[in-house]
Amino acid sequence: MLQAPNPASRADQTLSHNMKLLAHHELAGFGGLGEGMSMQMTSDGRRILWLAHESAPKNFSGVDVTDPSNPKLIVQTELPHMKLRSNSLDVVGDIMVVAYQASTVGI
């Protein structure tokens, strides 16, 4: 039976028999992610992985994964206040849609 991966896993460790961890990114310490995840192929050929954050203060992050073994954080945005979270997101072409959830009605 396979054990749950250790958060400090190294790229050279085998976590599964049919998959290999290529890299890990700490997202500047804001790794609490929601369901929102989308891959974008840019006009210049880069692959950007967009990630929604589960809780404030971060809204979403963009990670350049063109070289999957060397991911680069290229943008990380802030929510307008602590009572929101970015539940999910999607990207089509150059347009991103983010769904927010509020902890208080009417914000």
Where are these regions (language model features)?
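Feature marking well-ordered beta-strand scaffolds used for ligand recognition
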Residues: 1-107
